[in-house]
Amino acid sequence: MLDKFIMSCTRQLVGSSDKKRKKTQKPLDGVDVARDIMTENEPVFYDVYRDRARQGALPVIFDIHGGGWVYGDKALNDVYITHLARRGYAVVSPEYRLLADGADLKAQIKDLSDCMADAYKRREELGLDFSRAYLAGDSAGGHLATLLWSIAHSERLQALYGVQAPPFSVRAIGLSHPVPDPAAKLGGVMGANLRMLQKHFSKDPEILQNMSICRFAKEIPLPKIFLISCGKDALSPLSVDFAHWLEENGAEYVFKFYDKKDHPKLSHVFDVAFPHYEESQQAISEMLDFFEKA
């Protein structure tokens, strides 16, 4: 009961903050959105954003929203997504069930996998070029993005999570202030919250032992990763540790870190929450350049 109360409070507090923030923002003009596309397997929906002026099939970014696994929906990152779309990408924004509503990690992976497969099936209708496909995720969405990559490259994990590998290859992943390993040690309120969530990710101990890309360095090929973080973010130690892990395991990556002294206004997922910031535009540009070279 206490856990559900905490998740409910988190959802209300973050939701209130996001509503206040989004009242001061608006999506960029010139972007068309195909909304509420429903997958065949479950009543799971996704949206697709495209620059109105561009014709034909466009490279695809699957953007997985954050929200601590307990909050958010496919419209949460809509302003940020329009900044990606205006730069020539078709952006798929999937919905997934939340821990606060009684779902578990396996259900979240299933929803996201279904959205990816359905978008591929409709690629001609939606104008999606899957020869240039990328994943992006912020905060908890970063965890889900890297876990999806891991599952796609492991038959063992596909069996464990009850999903199939996507029918296309992902060329690179963009991560904003991610939680690559939800079981990582972290102090303070954020660390306490991660520890509380452990029992809600799954009741299956095998899932709990296999829910982070950091466990699979010898089992899967590692993705090319563009990693963004900042010193004011309480979760930044996780990004720093992840960058070290990528380095130790020979992954191709870029770590874009904005220190607190020179960038005092930047906080958790600033590039997604405030894409109009100069630093956000810089980070977005460099991430997309990284994608194009992947």
Give each language-model segment a name:
Residues M1-A294:
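Alpha/beta-hydrolase superfamily serine-hydrolase fold, recognizing
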